[in-house]
């Protein structure tokens, strides 16, 4: 340094200090000859500091000395050996050693092993240590799952704690057409995974266990499932192997199981279009309780021409015994596509929940509820909610050939149907509730309810249901002596039907309330062979004037009750053409806007309620006043003068009165002067008919 600055404190601004600092920094940063430079103190002896170049050299030496030098020094008993550096290794009898640190090199070994051995460290695993430290070092470690019995303290225990994975059993796969795992037949590996999970539960006392598949494509024939085993797909696609036999199920859970689950994201792919048209299969086949199928794509299941088998997910009883029914099962968040038969079939089940799924482009129903056989299947409690259906033939079919109450307590709501023939199709069911926000675009029936006499249908409610298109909005049909017991239709919006918005046959306990209809062709509401039906607050609008009744009571219908009707665009409001005379109850006022004939009834029918109108007397002693409400034995008619001439007439000997015996049922009543002489013909009256 040019100046002695040892007396100046740190931070001094003295020019000499600044000069020395500049010189030191120049050496520290730019020298390629000096590894060290001396600082200026101060107020202590100067210390050596690393130059930048010196730090580089020191680092390079460290890297160089970190590896072992090969070939090793050979130790020969009885011969001295000098070890110059710590990186040198010594070989004796095939084993490697290094000098134990710390040590002062060079180290002189005597050649007497008993004296030299304490100075050395056994190093035969050093190369393995370095290989294990590499990025792929984990591939050198073997592992076989064991049962945990203590807290996790080792890598072995940590590995034992993770879900069982199918790749643990890849060694069992023998059918490998190519190195690509997507071409292998993984059935043995999946079966071993499931069986191992079952064994683990039996030995550990666990109630359920988790397995893991994905990601990747795995070709399989059929996996026989076990109770308690839950599998997370993790992006896996389980795909039917090209050699799969006819009639199998990709996942076969039919051994009277309990507590099983299949969770996405993942795919169950039957790959049906690559098989012979006669090839049949199921996706997930369950004879089980406590089942969950969630967040999966289930696609390409079934056969092209054979309609037995072919379901995406099916719940069944034991066949033929019928001694086991599915229970507490859920399918949610799944997407079904290109399913040849039913996307989901319930042939047996208590508390079955089908929630928030998508159903697309499949041959038959999104959900088919159909008891297996005559006495084997039992269905009690099915919820179908929040689903989206597009391109299936049916939305929900619930069909049984069993006796009363074989299928009951079915609730459907909040579903959307597009491009379907029928949204709902019920046969032989009881306690069914449909609607609750449903929207349906159909080509035939919004809801079809059927009874043929072999089974009965009871307690059907359709509420808050919007349907458009098709032939019928709601069609309750009976044949061969069939009948319905209690059907309630409320808060419906029906548009664009070609035959009838609502037709109901052979029902006791029919209620139609708060229904809004807009049509431009076909008939109106048709009630046939029903006992005491009630229609309230029905709004019927013909988009063009339709020459049909808005509401028709026909056949053996008895005691119909109507009220609050709002009808426009029809030539006839309410038509009663029953085969026998009956009493019609008018429950409240009705509005017939532009309807030429508000009421059309067969003579003899008695319409309870109140009818009113006006007329002008003829210049005669008597005249007939038309009114469909007239009943010759029961009607009470009041005449109300509405001008001075009528008041004068009523105050004198010519007072007009109604002669029931000369009137005609449902056609007209006879008005006659009291003295039998002619009225002036200028008298105007209002009338009120009371049918009590």
UniProtKB/Swiss-Prot annotation:
Record-linked InterPro entries: PbH1 (IPR006626), Pectin_lyas_fold (IPR012334), Pectin_lyase_fold/virulence (IPR011050)
PbH1 repeat spans: 326-348, 349-371, 379-400, 406-428, 457-478, 507-529, 557-578
A biological-process GO annotation: viral life cycle
Protein localization: Virion
Keywords assigned by UniProt, alphabetized: Repeat, Virion
Main location: virion
Gene Ontology terms: cellular component: virion component
Keyword Magnesium: no
Cysteine pairings via disulfide bonds: none
Job description of the protein: Structural protein.
Protein name: Structural protein 2
Natural source organism: Pseudomonas phage PAJU2
